[in-house]
């Protein structure tokens, strides 16, 4: 039985007019999704530990030291973005920094999960998995037929800025349940758009040595989509 393109490295073009080697592009895609899968497994593991070991969220949410630790962990991914980009092509430093980045995000996600019921977290996780899988398959299918989603970039970036501003405003002026649910719904649509956009970029635009950048982008897309869906279901 003949193997599929994904298994063999791809004999067919990923998109019309493809001039590069499809085998090299498929190798890049496999490497990227292997890294992303490891990141997601680490996130599930760390989040599960934080969720089920109740002294951890209690320390974070009920003590001043815990809040300070959580604030540092929230800032850590932002601080790590520079070394991630600076050492992107320097192995194994890039993998070490990426691991720390993933662990810090995972801990933050675990704290967010600990504030919700287990059933709600599970529903959000299942919805996220279904949407990510569906959007990824759709993007590969659409790109194969000549569609290009690069035009989404400016619109998604503008929407992301609005989301960041609203998130900061909620710190000082918390939204009601209905407003918070609407906000989470809009955010989930934006991050669905980002999954399509970033998948399009990894198929057509990114260089073969930019797998760290691609992994970070897709990982953040998935995590933000999960947190947005968690916000919808929680409300």
UniProtKB/Swiss-Prot annotation:
Tissues in which the protein is found: Expressed at very low in leaves.
Domain of life: Eukaryota
Entry's Gene Ontology BP terms: cellular response to unfolded protein; defense response
An example Gene Ontology CC term for this record: membrane
Gene knockout outcome: Delayed development of the powdery mildew fungus E.cruciferarum. Increased cell death upon A.alternata f.sp. lycopersici (AAL) toxin treatment.
Main localization category: membrane
Keyword Ribonucleoprotein: no
Segments passing through the bilayer: 33-53, 67-87, 95-115, 120-140, 149-169, 178-198, 212-232
Entry's localization field: Membrane
Family the UniProt entry places it in: Belongs to the BI1 family.
Protein name: Protein LIFEGUARD 1
């Amino acid at each position: 039985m003949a193997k599929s393109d994904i298994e063999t490295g791809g004999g067919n073009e990923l998109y019309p007019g493809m001039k590069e080697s499809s085998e090299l592009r498929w190798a890049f895609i496999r490497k990227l999704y292997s890294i992303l899968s490891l990141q997601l497994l680490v996130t599930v593991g760390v989040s599960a530990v934080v969720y089920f070991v109740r002294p951890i969220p209690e320390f974070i949410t009920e003590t001043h030291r815990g809040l300070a630790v959580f604030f540092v962990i929230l800032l850590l991914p932002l601080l790590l973005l520079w070394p991630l980009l600076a050492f992107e092509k320097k192995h194994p430093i890039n993998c070490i920094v990426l691991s720390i980045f993933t662990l810090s995000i995972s801990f933050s996600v675990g704290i967010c999960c600990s504030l919700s019921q287990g059933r709600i977290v599970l529903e959000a996780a299942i919805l996220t998995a279904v949407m990510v899988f569906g959007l990824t398959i759709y993007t590969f299918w659409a790109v194969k037929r000549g569609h290009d989603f690069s035009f989404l970039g400016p619109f998604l970036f503008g929407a992301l800025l609005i989301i960041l501003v609203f998130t900061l405003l909620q710190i000082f002026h918390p939204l009601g349940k209905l407003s918070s649910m609407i906000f989470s719904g809009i955010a989930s649509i934006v991050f669905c758009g980002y999954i399509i956009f970033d998948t399009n970029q990894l198929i057509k635009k990114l260089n073969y040595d930019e797998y760290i950048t691609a992994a970070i982008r897709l990982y953040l897309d998935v995590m933000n989509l999960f947190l947005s869906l968690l916000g919808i279901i929680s409300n």
